[in-house]
From Swiss-Prot:
Keywords: Arginine metabolism, NAD, Oxidoreductase. NCBIfam families: arg_catab_astD, PRK09457.1. It comes from Idiomarina loihiensis (strain ATCC BAA-735 / DSM 15497 / L2-TR). This is N-succinylglutamate 5-semialdehyde dehydrogenase. Pfam families: Aldedh (PF00171). One of its GO terms (molecular function) is succinylglutamate-semialdehyde dehydrogenase activity. SUPFAM superfamilies: ALDH-like. InterPro entries: Ald_DH/histidinol_DH (IPR016161), Ald_DH_C (IPR016163), Ald_DH_CS_CYS (IPR016160), Ald_DH_CS_GLU (IPR029510), Ald_DH_N (IPR016162), Aldehyde_DH_dom (IPR015590), SuccinylGlu_semiald_DH_AstD (IPR017649). The keyword NAD applies.
Length: 489
């Protein structure tokens, strides 16, 4: 039976490209299959978005918001179905995918506030006229979604883009096509007009056809640094196109002078191992004071990590960690651990892949203190590297020794230490005594260096979804009392 997985110009249709499949990484079962969108279908989607743009952008923001709010209501009505779809396709526990759907539901209200605050109309009086600042949508924008948050993260681009009046062509991760399909069905049910939101499913060729098409006015990407850099090169010399890149990080978390050891360990675990380490903000490097207290924190961290429950997404009791996105990804994490051990790192908690055909791995901790030539890589999984330090300035210097700059944090009881850390650390998200995976949709989200291109998302997504237009306006004309030199009337 043909699976109509492409949503183009208001209609579902089968892809014309190669067959690809989605596999439940916790159970090694094929749960979805369909044909990729061809280059012709990608162009069809872009032209449909172009044709729909004048009407959609010409509507009042209240009309556009009404459809977005209906979408939010449908998320509420279908939250359990969508959460379980996410769990099957990503391997994340159901308790966690429910929180993702909740974040999607809250995005419309937050994006509405951001639209008015960041891109609203400003009026100022001036002699004989008024000055206005208004904003207009870019046109047709492409949205590329990741697999780790297949609902929430693309939603964070799509909702503000639609509110601003853009039309969208959405290319989700090829690893989570079912979540994308179910999400777009809710947009269809919400009454999104034909061509305003289009879905093109597929693998690399589909993505390349979309990013290379001359008719897109912008591209919003969340994913790996390697892909983001390729897109940046592709858009080089094209200042007419808006490009927003949200990429990863080699994120540091520093611990010093904490009285509550268990609270500190809880924050470390939440920073490093939540979502099986598959958040771009996850702590990859733990800087811990080489002292009696630091050793106590590390010993407790080892104990807690060894007892983290890893299991199926529907298991009862629910696990803290589910499967990674694929058996291949899980195997690559074990390989990354072994490479560090080969370089001289010491295993504190050994990561293991429990089944070579599934995405389950246990969390790992390696001590890399004194190890030379460590790769500045984002190991996208539950692998934490420990650096012991005696001098906080040296620790901060090493924390900054990365091409990335997404998230960072410090766990300490002294506010002065936090202020010092905040002043000297280079990152777009800096937390104190909270997990560094914690970020608010009511704040900007983004990093510096190889983590982004200065287009923060979340609350600041409104900024790249519209461009400012300055106007000086007068309802009548008259000659000035004093003419400029050299003029005669």
């Amino acid at each position: 039976m043909t699976n109509s997985i492409q949503f183009i110009d208001g209609c579902w249709e089968a892809g014309e490209g190669q067959l690809f499949k989605s596999i439940d990484p916790a159970r090694n079962e094929v749960i979805w299959s369909g044909e990729a969108a061809s280059e012709t279908q990608v162009e069809k989607a872009i032209l449909a978005a172009r044709a729909a743009f004048p009407d959609w952008s010409g509507r009042s923001v209240e009309e556009r918001l009404a459809i977005c709010q209906k979408f939010s209501e449908l998320l509420e009505e279908n939250k359990e179905h969508l959460a379980r779809t996410m769990a099957k396709e990503t391997g994340k526990p159901v308790w966690e995918t429910r929180t993702e759907v909740g974040a999607m539901m809250g995005k419309v209200a937050i994006s509405e506030r951001a639209y008015h605050e960041r891109t609203g109309t400003v009026e100022n009086d001036m002699p004989g006229a008024k000055a206005f600042i208004r904003h207009k949508p870019h046109g047709v924008v492409a949205v590329y979604g990741p697999y780790n948050f297949p609902g929430h993260l693309p939603n964070g681009h799509i909702v503000p883009a639609l509110i601003a009046g853009n039309t969208v062509v959405f290319k989700p991760s090829e690893l989570t096509p079912m979540v994308a399909q179910e999400t777009v069905k809710l947009w269809e049910k919400a009454g999104i007009p034909a061509g305003v939101l289009n879905l093109v499913q597929g693998e690399v060729d589909t993505g390349k056809a979309l990013s290379a098409h001359p008719q897109i006015d912008g591209l919003y990407f969340t994913g790996s640094s390697n892909t983001g850099h390729l897109l940046h090169k592709q858009f080089g010399g094209r200042p007419d196109k808006i490009l927003a890149l949200e990429m990863g990080g080699n994120n540091p978390l520093l611990v010093t002078n904490v009285a509550d050891v268990d609270a500190a360990v809880h924050n470390i675990v939440q920073s490093a191992f939540i979502t099986s380490g598959q958040r771009c903000t996850c702590a990859r490097r733990l800087f811990i004071e080489d002292s009696e207290q630091g050793r106590a924190v590390l010993e407790r961290l080892i104990e807690v990590t060894e007892n983290i429950l890893v299991d199926d997404y529907e298991a009862d009791p629910q696990p803290f960690m589910g499967a990674m996105i694929s058996a291949k990804a899980a195997g690559e994490m074990v390989d990354a651990q072994n490479e560090l051990l080969h370089k001289g790192a010491k295993s504190l908690v050994r990561m293991k892949q429990t089944d070579s055909k599934k995405g389950f791995v246990t969390p790992g901790i390696v001590d890399v203190t004194g190890v030379e030539d460590l790769p500045d890589e984002e190991h996208f999984g539950p692998l934490l590297k420990v650096y012991r330090f005696k001098d906080i300035d040296a620790a901060i210097k090493e924390a900054n020794n990365t091409r990335y700059g997404l998230s960072a944090g410090v766990l300490c009881d002294d506010e002065q230490t936090y202020r010092y850390f905040f002043k000297h650390i280079r990152a777009g998200i800096v937390n104190w005594n909270k997990p560094i995976t914690g970020a608010s949709s009511a704040a900007p989200f983004g990093g510096i260096g190889a983590s982004g291109n200065h287009r923060a998302s979340a609350y600041y997504a409104a900024d790249y979804c519209a461009y400012p237009v300055a106007s000086v306006e007068a309802d009548s004309m008259s000659l000035p009392e004093s003419l400029a030199p050299g003029l005669k009337f």
